[in-house]
Amino acid sequence: MKILIIQQRYGIGDLIIFLPYIHAISKKFKTKVSLLVKESSKASDLLSNDKNIDEILILDKDKDGIKGFFKLSNEIKKRKFDKVFIFNSSLRYNLIAKFSGVKSVFQYPLFRSKDNLVHSAKIFTENVTGEIISTEPNLNIKSIHEFDKNIKHVGLGISASGLTKRWDIQNYIRLAQELKKNINVNFI
């Protein structure tokens, strides 16, 4: 069985948020999945060692507009996917999947404008798999650095792809100070 998951959000954080749901679909159908993602998600770098991922397809600008619709449809059609899971409510991706000859298309309800990213993905995936899904992401990284296991190691991602996702630098400083005060923590 060949499965495609479409996750068209821009950021690295967005991709990581969706990982538990991507993994759950892979496990449910006992097969690796292909992902259609934006280049800016860095999926090719982050997921190169992920045992649940077969192939990463990049959703770039040449797949925009009418010409892009047909180009993307042909790219999907060539791969002969059996199922497509669309993590958004876009009519465009629904039509692309159907135009590509995919028989089973699963997607959020069409035309939904307001959306809680984690809640919607969790409900969608739980409906598909019939199981409760943990929201804890798991990146399969090839080389693990030697870290002291008695210390919490925290990385702060202080940039974001969209203005609505950005937090003032002073907030990060206060967060780091509070964490340092209450937990044995090392910032990496």
Which residue ranges define each predicted feature?
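Catalytic machinery of carbohydrate-active enzymes
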Residues: M1-I188
